[in-house]
Structures are given as C-alpha cells and as structure tokens.
C-alpha cells in the first residue's frame, strides 16, 4: 500500500511539473494575451470619460405645523412624523426636479454626431455643454454656440434633430425622414409656424460652424428620468433624519451645479408648504376672531344691562363654585370646538384623532348638562346672573386665547424657515470616481494572464500527440533511437527559413546545437543496426508531413560525413521534397530525370560543401512517382550507390499519405520512422507499422523529434540542462 501511494504521488508530481513546463514553453502566448489585454484597457481608458461624484446632506427636523398653535397639547397627538422615505420620494419627485430642469434648461440635450465609442477613440473632438438659467452653451473644441430659445412642438419632443450651420444660418433636419424642418438665421430670434406647431428658436454664435450636431428637447418625464439615472437619495443610518444626496456625471462643474439647485428647490418647496399651512390657519382665525369678538360684546352688554337693572346680587359660596366650574367647562368646550373645526380641514370624521376629540367633546357636554341641571335649582335671579357672567368669562378667555395664537402665527409666518436644514452643500470634486485606471490596468494584466494561461492549457490539451519516448517503446515494442530537442536557432528562424530558397544546415552552422548533439549520439545505434542489416541503405520516413524528416535526414547525413564517411542523401519525395534548399541547389537535374533516362548518374549526383557528402535532388515532379520508384532502374540505382558509398540516406514521402515510402523501404536495410513531439498521434504510428508489416518490411526504430525544452519531462529536461551547461562552460573556456 505504501509503495502504491508513493508511486501515485510521484506520477502526480511529474504531471504537475509537465503542466508547469508546458505553460513556460508557451510564455509568448501568455505574454501576447497580457499585452493585448493591456492595449484593450488603455483604449477603454482613452475612450471612456472620467466620472465624478458630488454629495450633499439634508437634515429633516421634527415637523411642527401652524396648527400646533391652536391644538396645544393635542398637537402631539395629531402631528404625524414624516418618515425619511417620504422626504426621499419628494427629493426625487417632479415637483423638485422639474423646477431644477426648468431653471437650468436641463431638458435640452446637445451632442456631436461623432460620439460613439469608436469616435471618441479616434476623434479629437472635445464636446462640453454648459447649462445656464437663460441659455445653454455648447462648446466644440474652440467653437461655441449659445441656444437661448428652443421652443418646439410637442410632437418633436424626445426626438433627435440634426442641427447644421452654414454661412450664418442654421437648419433643423428630421433624423427619421431626413427632411429639413426649418431654416433660420443665427444671432436673432426665429419664429415659424408649421403644420406641427409653433417653433421659436434663437441660436447665437460668433464662430464659423460647419459641423453637424444632434439636439433633443426632452419632455419633463424624460428629463426627470435622465437625472434619476445618476441621482440617488438615501438615509444615513436608521431613523437619523439625515438624508444623503449623490449625483454623478462626467462634467464635475455641471453635476455640482445641478445638485445645489436640487437642494435649493427642495428647501423652497418645503418652506412654501409650511407657509401655506400657516396662511390657511391665519385665514381661519381671520374669519373666527370678528365673530367671536361680536359674541363677546353681546355677552358683555347683556351682563352689564342685568347689573344696572338689579344693582347687586348676593351670590352664595356654592353658587360661586358652580360658576367657576361652569366657566371652565364652557371654555374647554369652546376651545375643543375650535380644534375640531381646525382638524376637520385635515382629517375625516372617521380618523382616530377626530373620534377622540369628539369623544372628549361629548364628555364635556355631559358635565355641562349635569351642572346646568344643578344651576336650575338655584333662585331665578342668581341663576340668571351666573349664566350671564359665565357667558362673558367663556367668550373672554376664548377670544384672548385665539388672539394670542393669531399674533404668534403672524410672527411665525414672518420668520418661516421650514423643517429641513441643508447640512452640507455640493462641492466640486477633485478626483474622478471612475474609471479606476490603476485597478483596470492591474485587472487587465491578471485577465490577460488568465486568458493566456487558459489558451495555453487548451492548446496543450489539443496537442494530444506523443510526449514521451517510453510511450512508444511500451506500446509498439520498438526502440527510440534518439530524442531530438527543438533547436533554439531553428525555432527563432523557422518562419524566415520557410520563405528562403536556401536553408542552412544546422550541423554546419551550429555544430554544438543540442539537436545536433542528440543526432550524434544516434550514430552508435545506427552502426549496430547496420551491422546486422542486409545493406547500408537507410530510409527516413514518417506517418504525416511536417514531422521533420528532411531536417533529420540532412543533419544526420552531415554528421555521418563529418566522421570521414562517404554519404549520399537522396530526396525520394518526388512530389514535395525540398532537400535541394539545404544545399543551395536547383531541383533539376535530379532523381526524376535519372529514372526517366533523361540524365546520367554522374550528372544527378552533386557534391556539397560538406566533405564526403553528396546529394541527389528530387528533380521535376513527375506524373507517376510510384511507378518510377518501383522500377528496376531505381532498384539498380540503390544497389550501385550502396557499393559506392558508406551510407545512403533516403528521405521518403509520408507513409500514410502515399505508398512511395513503403516501396522504397523494401530495398533498404534500416528503416527509421520520425515522430514529432506533441503532434504525431500514437494511432498514426500504429497505422504506419501496419503498412510496413503488410509489405513485409521491418521497422528498426523511431526518432522522436522537436521535443520542447520547457515542456519536457524530467529526463528530457536533464538532457537539456546538461547540454546548455556544457555549452556555457565551453564558451567560457
């Protein structure tokens, strides 16, 4: 159990290491994604205007209306405290925002026609709109025009209209029908009546304007909604009565101006509402005081008349007590009736406050009835005296109370300030709140790195080819003669080399390259394979194109020639062979011309700059390459070359594409198959072996080509590191 667990952990570690190295191998892809992500972020920051935010604070104080002067102690019962949510809705209402829109002409929207994301990215135009109480000023870089009147028919509200300037005139064009609505002169008032309605427009400018602009007169609901998209109100804390106002926009001066205008409008409507309540109460008192004064005068005349007629009346202590109680009850009744009349203007009879006040009034009437019944038992003269005296006292106290309330309300109206207090006004911001440039750049780096890593992983998953030589040896039971790493020199010049007519031989130009060192290590294995082979002919084949057959063939032939061997390399890929590019030769004369009898053997065998190395190019592409390669002429050619040279290397076409490689391998002693790292599939190698077996040909082994350094496993990585360390020491020597 322990051994199995340890093996599993080791395999997992190797897998993670291979994954890590595969990402390092694709660092260019990841870096490219990061760069592209940064470029996109920079373009976004260039095209996105800065967004600013302004704030203000409002305190909503306890609401004590003018009716409190009349209701007295009952005002605490009648008064309804307005929650913060009610004031928030008022701050968002058309009542408040409509005044701001009308005052600053915020219902007029002007923009350039080049205002899309792409236009802002490429166009140098800088547009700015300044809203003023009497006009709207629009700036296009250094050019300015001022709209002082723009009254249009209702049918054109909320519609974009093209505004064009030319030769001191302007024209308005319907963007939907592209028809000119009207034409007017600048720097004067223009009035025109059309079938749609009356137009009254005044545009002033001192500049020569030749551009086209879009102008829109919004309806009140649309203008309010336009403000509400960037405007918010919320209570600070819970039940604090402090409201926080926030407004955002791209023009910091404009948003500060708008938010302060909202504060002024809200404060004014609050004062006007409270003043209206006070005025309503004063109007009620103006109606009640003269009538009450008249009633008091009548009561006093009756009482004085009674006293003159009967001089003085002996009133007992008991009668005085009844009189005091009666006056108190009648005064309370009169005051309560006044309160009921005042509250009746605000509440229905079913309101709890009205029900409670009516219940109190009923209780007082009941007590007055009981007291009147007691007073009837007194002597007639005393009873009449008490009634008249009570009437005078009640009217006097009630009149005095209402007169005091009236004077207090007049003073309150003169100093009315409302129940809201502006704690903080809007102050022009300094720094924008968006876009957050540093965060966006950092995020773009992480996003680019993530996308690059994801693409690298997907690319690695798609590259499901052979990545380990042991996989070939275990599944196909054949040796891998060499694992050839990707040459750093070849990798850096691969795109250039494909386009050139001449491809340099790596074994000549960079003889100490790690790929060449791997091929040198294969010489011993080839020597043992040839010792038991029927001849010295070696075929280099592969299952598919672009596995590196020509690269391996050329450099292997060069290495063998450098060890004082006579080597011939034949380009048997008569369709697409390009061995001639390695030796800076023409394709003709070549193998095709030799087999067709058009050229002699001495003519097609050409010597190269590498001592001991000769080459036969493919020649002109024939119509029947398979027939030529299966002919006796080709067989005889190979037999002659086998005797003349120490090694004959034949570069063949892909086995799975055409049968040429199988035909050639029937004549050779050693057959090697090239597999490309992470590209060649195991299934391709199995099919290739089946093709050879069907033809009765033995495959000696494989060469795993183009192993990438950073994505190699432990064994490959060790070989790489050793080669690089050895090369570095050599250079230092």
From Swiss-Prot:
It is a multi-pass membrane protein. One of its GO terms (molecular function) is protein tyrosine kinase activity. Pathway: Glycan metabolism; exopolysaccharide biosynthesis. It is an enzyme of class 2 (transferase). ATP binds at residues 542-550. GO terms for biological process: polysaccharide biosynthetic process. The chain crosses the membrane at residues 19-39, 438-458. Autophosphorylated on several Tyr residues. Dephosphorylated by ptp. Changing residue 651 to N: Loss of autophosphorylation. Belongs to the etk/wzc family. This is Tyrosine-protein kinase ptk. The gene is ptk.
